[in-house]
Amino acid sequence: MARYIGPKCRLARREGVDLELKSGVRPSESKCNMNAAPGQHGGRRGRLSDYGGQLREKQKLKRTYGVLERQFRNYYKKAVQQKGSTGENLLILLEQRLDNVVYRMGYGSTRAEARQLVSHGAIEVNGQRVTIASYQVQAEDIVSVREQSRKQIRIQSALEIAKQRGFVDWIEVDAAKMSGQFKRVPERIDLSADINESLVVELYSK
């Protein structure tokens, strides 16, 4: 399945929440009407069945982190094999993706832009260039912009937006050096309350 490259507002309106697919220069609510489904005649959303709700939650999570179905299913299988809550394990695995950490550190204004920075070789982990977006970042890893990429306007602009927005508690960023530390693996309480990961577990458990 190909990666979606169409209007980002369409995806956000489909799920009814901000999926952080836009740059954050303006609030998503000012760009996308979250109260209406996509389409010219998108009206109120109908009541979903249990299965429909589970499917929507899976789509919301996949679209937030920019992961396709096969890879998402592999994350679920890995989460099942780990100790603890499968749903929480799944969220943490997604949070540890390098493209997500690059986004959290403010080097990319969106996860899609962060993924592109990784694939283009602009990012280092512990001083070594890594070009795999799905690379799993571990606690205390140092994630930096490579020296030859630090003059890119898009990275500088993204960092300015990130400084205004603020950084999450589990990372520490030195914006001047374009370097940050993934201090710890986040806990469930740190992550979005808009996600109901138990519905995703129910869907895949059938």
From Swiss-Prot:
Residues 96-158 form the S4 RNA-binding domain. One of its GO terms (cellular component) is small ribosomal subunit. The keyword Ligase does not apply. Residues 27-47 are annotated as: Disordered. SUPFAM superfamilies: Alpha-L RNA-binding motif. One of the primary rRNA binding proteins, it binds directly to 16S rRNA where it nucleates assembly of the body of the 30S subunit. Belongs to the universal ribosomal protein uS4 family. This is Small ribosomal subunit protein uS4.
